[in-house]
From Swiss-Prot:
Localization in the cell: Secreted
Recorded family membership: Belongs to the venom metalloproteinase (M12B) family. P-III subfamily. P-IIIa sub-subfamily.
Task performed by this protein: Snake venom zinc metalloproteinase that catalyzes the conversion of prothrombin (F2) to alpha-thrombin through formation of a thrombin intermediate, without requiring additional cofactors. Also inhibits collagen-dependent platelet aggregation in vitro, an effect that does not depend on proteolytic activity. In vivo, at low doses, induces defibrin(ogen)ation when injected intravenously or intramuscularly into mice. At higher doses, causes sudden death by intravenous administration due to numerous occluding thrombi in pulmonary vessels.
UniProt source species: Bothrops asper (Terciopelo)
Name of protein: Snake venom metalloproteinase basparin-A
């Protein structure tokens, strides 16, 4: 099984390759069922506050 911290770090690194440098905050959250959502934006937020203009991606479950 994957280590969650390593997986979240990998997601953040991948998202960073797509981020505008001004989008300083890169975040990743586990969203249940082993799925993860990562995004970059100017300020941190909870997953439910992610806005349409955030760069984001949902990864399928890995568990």
């Amino acid at each position: 099984s994957h280590d969650n911290a390593q997986l979240l770090t990998a997601i953040k690194a991948y998202i960073a390759t797509m981020c505008d440098p001004k989008m300083a905050v890169i975040m990743a959250h586990e969203i249940g069922h082993g799925g993860y959502y990562g995004y970059c934006r100017k300020i941190p937020c909870a997953p439910e506050d992610v806005k349409d203009d955030d760069i984001g991606m949902v990864l399928p479950g890995t568990k």
